[in-house]
């Protein structure tokens, strides 16, 4: 892994794209997590990093404690098999994943945030709580991800 700085970004423009696409994870309920990977496609205002509209794709997955425990047991079994000279491997079950594309506008995002208790003025820089954990954001990708998260969770429509 390497550190991102202005020189790196100037020399390697592709690095900047990967750097801005971020994964957000937060605890939703006792046994569920929501993983978000936004894709930026849309119209930007000139000279501003503000998205007026966009299409976002989000991966929503649910994982339960039982699956995590079975994954650790599987890892222990694999180590035991390797120690015994057995070449067979076991794989754990992966959580279910759903992907969805949704049209987003700045105004609908602000309205969604207000419905869940956001009182700030700037939608691109905020701190809000969902369930037991907090989610902080600053930037276009987080803007899309949080709007989509609210839609997926059914808290705004």
Curated annotation (Swiss-Prot):
<protein>
    <recommendedName>
        <fullName>Uncharacterized protein MPN_458</fullName>
    </recommendedName>
</protein>
<dbReference type="Pfam" id="PF17374">
    <property type="entry name" value="DUF5396"/>
</dbReference>
<comment type="similarity">
    <text>To M.pneumoniae MPN_456 and M.genitalium MG321 central region.</text>
</comment>
<dbReference type="InterPro" id="IPR035158">
    <property type="entry name" value="DUF5396"/>
</dbReference>
